[in-house]
């Protein structure tokens, strides 16, 4: 299990996920918009 001395905790995970989403946000939004346009055109 995780000990109190462990430096990797839930807050680190949240910050890592937030940072990753912020880096990939534009690409993800473009993909979503493209997929939506393809669905709307079909």
Curated annotation (Swiss-Prot):
Expressed by the venom gland. Contains six disulfide bonds. Its EC number is 3.1.1.32. One of its GO terms (molecular function) is phospholipase A1 activity. GO terms for biological process: killing of cells of another organism; lipid catabolic process. It catalyses: a 1,2-diacyl-sn-glycero-3-phosphocholine + H2O = a 2-acyl-sn-glycero-3-phosphocholine + a fatty acid + H(+). It is an enzyme of class 3 (hydrolase). Keywords: Allergen, Cytolysis, Disulfide bond, Hemolysis, Hydrolase, Lipid degradation, Lipid metabolism, Secreted. The keyword Secreted applies. One of its GO terms (cellular component) is extracellular region. Its main location: secreted. It is found in: Secreted. It comes from the Eukaryota. The keyword Secreted applies. Catalyzes the hydrolysis of phosphatidylcholine with phospholipase A1 activity. May act as an allergen and induce hemolytic activity. Belongs to the AB hydrolase superfamily. Lipase family. This is Phospholipase A1. It comes from Polistes gallicus.
């Amino acid at each position: 299990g995780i000990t109190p001395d462990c430096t990797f905790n839930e807050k680190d995970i949240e910050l890592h996920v937030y940072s990753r989403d912020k880096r990939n946000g534009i690409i993800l939004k473009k993909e979503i918009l493209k997929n939506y346009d393809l669905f709307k055109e079909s």
